[in-house]
Amino acid sequence: MGDRGVRLGLLMPMLALLSWAASLGVAEETPSRIPADKLLVITVATKENDGFHRFMNSAKYFNYTVKVLGQGQEWRGGDGMNSIGGGQKVRLMKEAMEHYAGQDDLVILFTECFDVIFAGGPEELLKKFQKTNHKIVFAADALLWPDKRLADKYPGVHIGKRYLNSGGFIGYAPYISRLVQQWNLQDNDDDQLFYTKVYIDPLKREALNITLDHRCKIFQALNGATDEVVLKFENGKSRVKNTFYETLPVAINGNGPSKILLNYFGNYVPNSWTQENGCALCDFDASDLSTVDVYPKVTLGVFIEQPTPFQPRFLDLLLTLDYPKEALRLFVHNKEVYHEKDIKAFVDKAKHDISSIKIVGPEENLSQAEARNMGMDFCRQDEKCDYYFSVDADVVLTNPRTLKILIEQNRKIIAPLVTRHGKLWSNFWGALSPDGYYARSEDYVDIVQGNRVGIWNVPYMANVYLIQGKTLRSEMSERNYFVRDKLDPDMSLCRNARDMGVFMYISNRHEFGRLISTANYNTSHLNNDLWQIFENPVDWKEKYINRDYSKIFTENIVEQPCPDVFWFPIFSERACDELVEEMEHYGKWSGGKHHDSRISGGYENVPTDDIHMKQIDLENVWLHFIREFIAPVTLKVFAGYYTKGFALLNFVVKYSPERQRSLRPHHDASTFTINIALNNVGEDFQGGGCKFLRYNCSIESPRKGWSFMHPGRLTHLHEGLPVKNGTRYIAVSFIDP
């Protein structure tokens, strides 16, 4: 038979024995679990940016051991986002693996770092790797790149993703070393293509025992998979779940254009925010200004780019910020001639406390983008400028600690959440549409409504934000940050920040203020804010309703100087003054004539020298004012009566000795009447008042901003008492005629 025949004769019984043993269920011994200290994470980062620090923080959270290659080196691997490249990473891996090639029990995890976060720990990762029963496992992708012509060379897959993704792979050190030792290309050649060609070569794939993580048990590449993944809250933890394969990936990679989705997941994973514990990282790396002797220098950029209501209030609030004025510099761009008087009044106040003020007015004819570039550069060029705080004219900062709070959060870019009252409109977007515009993230409503509170990494913020000065002089050193393609300036800023890898945060940890609506702001009147009751009801109320109005319902401050004549505060001083100014500006007083074309029938039995609200287009505003602020008082003082809040006659009356000094006794054509004093007795006029004849009761010292409310057509016959000198103004409505 010869030696060969003898060996074959011995081998056949052994094979038969093995087959027999297998048929009896005799299995190989289960390999022991790989200890966590036998895992080494390797990544490449020639620079450190926000994405890198996020990756390292997630690794630290799970106690991964990480080795960073390429630190301090020049990146020569090309622009991987927009073209092929990345070969430098393979070259660095090749050099590093020479040190680990002989460690058979060491497992190497290579992963990107700028756009990766860990969602699970080393034990989970190693357990899933061992279950694959392969020496090297690559991330899998539904998209084939960079060479689609290689599709036919990939082995088929029954379930799962078919194509290799080089953003993450795990394997035993000797096998990883053998893999990268095959690299002999240039730094700017493509790493993805290199690994792809190794994998699709059947001999190399078998020799290195490579497989792909087809069902995303270890790696989740987000690009092309946005409809597969959701956020999962369970047992006090936050995870990313792949709903297609019912898996919980360990490493989440926001490859390609999916970085915004990764940023969204990064707000929660790993356990950055949970339903049970809220925000875990809100105070991470925060500072405390109460411990400093010298406050950081801040450039305050103020931008008025369109006619905006309530500007004096906006500007005054900036001066009430709880921050040392000697640490502030001021840059103001005002595009509107309409607001020049407001700016002048503001500067006259500010110049006593703020030493450096730069005003760029409408005469400069700067575009919004040019002005914003100039303001930001005002800080960038000053080495002493620690922060740039940009505030638009439509932001009402009601929290005086806003600036301090933002500085203490210690983020490169951070904005306070501000919203329009009663609406979901805010100064941030939680997601972007494919064309780069607004899309609503899953958590947007919860953040706006305060159901989820924290510090949120977002793709877009505007209106008000704080940027670190050192960031402007490093990552954001390009001066033309607000101009890009045909984008609006705010979108251009955010796009540039995203491309530079600078994270933008929004904070809703505090109540900071609100946004004003500039829609339908008509500047054709003298005091245009009077018309803002619909667009900006909160600001309208703050400016025009008496501060003591709420005490009507809490402290019972309503007075009753005559039977069923109720007296209560309603208007602020400013409301009274502006209403009088508006009427005098219009100037067409009726003259107290009986013949009056403004009313039905054309005849007034008891005429007054007046101007109707309808004449100055204030009728709808006034009726809304009655429904919102007069009707609740009516219900309190006339229990059981529910007013419709409607009036045909709403007008301002002017009494003076020269024109009309008094008004004869009469009943009003109303169920009840309101009569609001618009100026001060003793200061603006002498005399005047109202006498209710049935009760022989007079009120001769009306209070500015206070209203009488009394029944109309039946019981309360009354007259206007003579004005001796000066001019008296009252606002009157005959309600529910």
Swiss-Prot record:
Annotated GO CC locations: collagen-containing extracellular matrix; endoplasmic reticulum; extracellular space; Golgi apparatus; rough endoplasmic reticulum membrane
A GO BP annotation: hydroxylysine biosynthetic process
A GO molecular-function descriptor: procollagen-lysine 5-dioxygenase activity
Localization terms from the record: Rough endoplasmic reticulum membrane
Span of the signal peptide: 1-25
Major site of localization recorded for this protein: endoplasmic reticulum
Modified residues (Phosphotyrosine): Y323
Catalytic activity: L-lysyl-[collagen] + 2-oxoglutarate + O2 = (5R)-5-hydroxy-L-lysyl-[collagen] + succinate + CO2
Pfam family, one: GT_PLOD
Glycoprotein recorded as keyword: yes
UniProt KW keywords: Dioxygenase, Endoplasmic reticulum, Glycoprotein, Iron, Membrane, Metal-binding, Oxidoreductase, Phosphoprotein, Signal, Vitamin C
Known glycosylation sites: N63, N209, N365, N522, N696, N725
Names of the cofactor(s): Fe(2+); L-ascorbate
Binding sites annotated in the UniProt record for Fe cation: H666, D668, H718
Entry EC number(s): 1.14.11.4
Annotated positions of the N6-succinyllysine modification: K704
Sequence ranges assigned to domain Fe2OG dioxygenase in this UniProt record: 644-737
Active site annotation, chain numbering: R728
Membrane topology designation: Peripheral membrane protein
Residues modified as Phosphothreonine: T320
Complexes and interactors: Homodimer.
Function, in words: Forms hydroxylysine residues in -Xaa-Lys-Gly- sequences in collagens. These hydroxylysines serve as sites of attachment for carbohydrate units and are essential for the stability of the intermolecular collagen cross-links.
Descriptive protein name: Procollagen-lysine,2-oxoglutarate 5-dioxygenase 2
Native source organism of the sequence: Rattus norvegicus (Rat)
